């Protein structure tokens, strides 16, 4: 479908905010000079919402006192965090930290963006921005330990491993997320079992939702394959194997199952008869896939569709677990 508003759908109107300033417009000239116009009880209001960026500089002055007998010099203590001649406040530091990490903006772009916003008044060094992560990790150590323990008790956890670069070297980031919003990131030099050591996954005893990284199958007590990934793989097969029918049928079935599952309330159990019918259709489509690949084997340069078929056949239970477990989501979007 095309981006933007969809025909036949109710639009998402912009919400008005509490005004910070009100301007009453004067009556039009023709109203002032025509006595036939009478003021009604109706008033039309329209809002223009904007933002502004201001630099706030608080300068502290502390007089120095000298003791002529002892030679001692003292002054009033400065507030906490005011140590150097120039110090940056928490709002500014948090802004740069989120810009650099949550918005995935480089250090150079982050400092340049801040400089542009403040008309060049604030130019922060790269080193200071780089140290924000270390400072954040140190200050949140107790919170991260608490989240770690809470995650171990969650019945469902989403996990993923993605590539990254640290100081120009290839690295990996393991992500662990639970439905209530808790998320932890673990930087590792290796993937596989070595990378999982020290993460929540290592000692987790619940159900894991993940893509088809077989390493994760050694952990947890249950597994749900990320169906968002599966749908993308099926779409790729549809684009590259246009003569096959199983991929289109399976794509449609998975969408139908997700729609059914999402339509259930939190307290509502899936209907056993409906689930059984879904499972039979799943097996039938895989049988069709087997016949199609027997009749026309996969090509030399594209075998992803065939590999997907074999995977969905071998790990059938892990693709359909969400039909039996109401706590599961059908994708690992939480960790994405």
Which residues does each predicted region cover?
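Conserved small/polar residues in nucleotide/adenosyl-binding loops
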Residues: 329-335
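Conserved beta-strand -> loop -> alpha-helix junction used to position metal-binding or nucleic-acid-contacting
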Residues: 212, 221-249
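Short conserved beta-strand segments at catalytic cores or DNA/RNA-binding microdomains
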Residues: 66, 99-106, 170-183, 230
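Short, positively charged, Gly/Tyr-enriched micro-motifs
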Residues: 52-155
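Long, amphipathic alpha-helical stalk/connector segments used for oligomerization, subunit docking
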Residues: 253-308
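Short, flexible loop/hinge motifs at secondary-structure junctions
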Residues: 1-84, 130, 159
């Amino acid at each position: 479908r095309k981006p933007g508003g969809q025909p036949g759908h109710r639009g998402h109107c912009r919400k008005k905010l509490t005004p910070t300033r009100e301007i009453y417009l004067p009556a039009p000239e023709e109203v002032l000079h025509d006595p036939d116009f009478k003021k009604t009880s109706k008033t039309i209001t329209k809002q223009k919402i904007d933002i502004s960026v201001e630099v706030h500089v608080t300068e502290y002055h502390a007089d120095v006192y000298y003791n002529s007998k002892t030679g001692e010099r003292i002054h009033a203590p400065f507030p906490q965090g005011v140590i150097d001649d120039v110090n940056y406040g928490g709002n500014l530091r948090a802004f740069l930290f989120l810009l650099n990490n949550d918005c995935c903006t480089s250090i150079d772009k982050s400092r340049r963006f801040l400089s542009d916003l403040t008309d060049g008044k604030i130019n922060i060094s790269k080193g200071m921005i780089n140290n924000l992560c270390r400072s954040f990790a140190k200050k949140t150590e107790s919170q991260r330990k608490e989240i770690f323990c809470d995650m171990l008790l969650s019945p469902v956890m989403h996990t993923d491993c993605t590539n990254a670069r640290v100081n120009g070297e290839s690295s990996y980031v393991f992500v662990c997320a639970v439905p209530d919003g808790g998320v932890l990131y673990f930087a590792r030099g290796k993937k596989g079992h070595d990378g999982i050591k020290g993460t929540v996954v290592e000692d987790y005893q619940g159900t894991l939702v993940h893509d088809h990284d077989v390493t994760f199958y050694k952990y947890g007590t249950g597994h749900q394959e990320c169906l968002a990934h599966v749908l993308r793989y099926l779409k790729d097969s549809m684009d590259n194997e246009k003569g096959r029918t199983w991929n289109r049928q399976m794509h449609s079935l998975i969408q139908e199952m997700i729609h059914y599952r999402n339509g259930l309330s939190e307290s509502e159990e899936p209907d056993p008869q409906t689930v059984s019918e879904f499972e039979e259709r799943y097996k039938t489509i895989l049988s069709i896939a087997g016949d199609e690949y027997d009749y026309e084997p996969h090509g030399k340069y594209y075998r992803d569709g065939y590999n997907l078929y074999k995977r969905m056949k071998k790990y059938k239970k892990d693709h359909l677990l969400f039909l039996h477990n109401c706590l599961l989501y059908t994708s690992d979007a939480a960790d994405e």
